[in-house]
Regions:
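A short SAM/SAH-binding and catalytic strip from SAM-dependent methyltransferases
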Residues: 116-130
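Short conserved loop adjoining the S-adenosyl-L-methionine
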Residues: 107-112
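A short, conserved alpha-helix within the catalytic core of class I
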Residues: 127-140
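N-terminal, positively charged/glycine-rich alpha-helical extensions of SAM-dependent methyltransferases
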Residues: 1-22
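Conserved beta-strand signature within the Rossmann-like core of class I S-adenosyl-L-methionine
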Residues: 147-156
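Conserved alpha-helix/loop element of class I SAM-dependent methyltransferases that forms part
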Residues: 32-48
Length: 225
């Protein structure tokens, strides 16, 4: 993200936090649906015992869902541009398996990989000078290079009845096309909210030509039987 849009983004969320404090409203969510988004993002992967990177983590509230799903058997690393949000997250989620850092995801040099990488809401703000489509592509590529199992991101859909001047709505078809450049193991969900969707990109897209079924899918099914 360039300096202009980075500064504007920081200012936007800093002002929201000063106005609303610890509240989804500070992050632009105001309809009580944040928990649904978190549950959807974590639905594609088995999270127990896994390392999770949360891009644009805000307060890190996805930890509530992770804790419930895994009985606290996970490690978490949240990264966000805004100091105030990170500090709030640190004060609320104090555990040895939870870390936070204030940094730009695209600029930060990671020294580790993560099993699962998630992001909620980071593509929804319309930039002033940065190209939103290129930003999405850069984040997808870097995240996929850093994960070992897969990524899960959500978006505002362009299949809407209206849109605000400050929001950016992505085409599900375009995002699906970007995903297929990275893997064949893809899932797109638009079955939980009419104007939002999530993309899941699995790292392992290997399969046996004899049955043409993804190996990871067979492992998942075998655990259920």
């Amino acid at each position: 993200m360039n300096n202009i849009d980075r500064d504007l983004t920081i200012e936007k969320y800093r002002e929201g936090y000063q106005k609303y404090g610890y509240s989804p409203k500070s992050l632009g969510w105001d309809k009580g649906r944040q928990k649904i988004r978190f549950e959807i993002l974590l639905s594609f992967f088995e999270c127990a015992g896994k390392s999770i990177l949360d891009i644009g983590c805000g307060f890190g509230d996805i930890n509530q869902t992770l804790s419930q799903k895994t009985s606290n058997a996970y490690s978490y690393f949240g990264i966000d541009l805004v100091d105030e949000l990170i500090n709030e997250g640190r004060s609320r989620y104090q555990s040895d398996h939870i870390r936070f850092i204030t940094a730009d995801f695209l600029e930060y040099s990671f020294t580790e990989k993560f099993d699962i990488i998630v992001a909620s809401g980071i593509f929804n703000h319309k930039f002033i000078s940065e190209d939103n489509d290129k930003f999405v592509e850069k984040v997808l590529k870097k995240a996929f290079s850093l994960c070992t199992e897969g990524v899960a991101f959500d978006f505002l859909s362009d299949k809407v009845d209206y849109c605000h001047s400050h929001t950016y709505h992505n085409s599900p078809e375009r995002i699906l096309g970007l995903a297929y450049k990275l893997s064949r193991n893809i899932c797109l969900r638009n079955d939980y909210m009419p104007f939002e969707f999530s993309i899941f990109i699995g790292k392992d897209d290997h399969f046996n030509p004899a049955d043409a079924i993804f190996n990871v899918y067979k492992k998942r099914i075998s655990k259920l039987s």
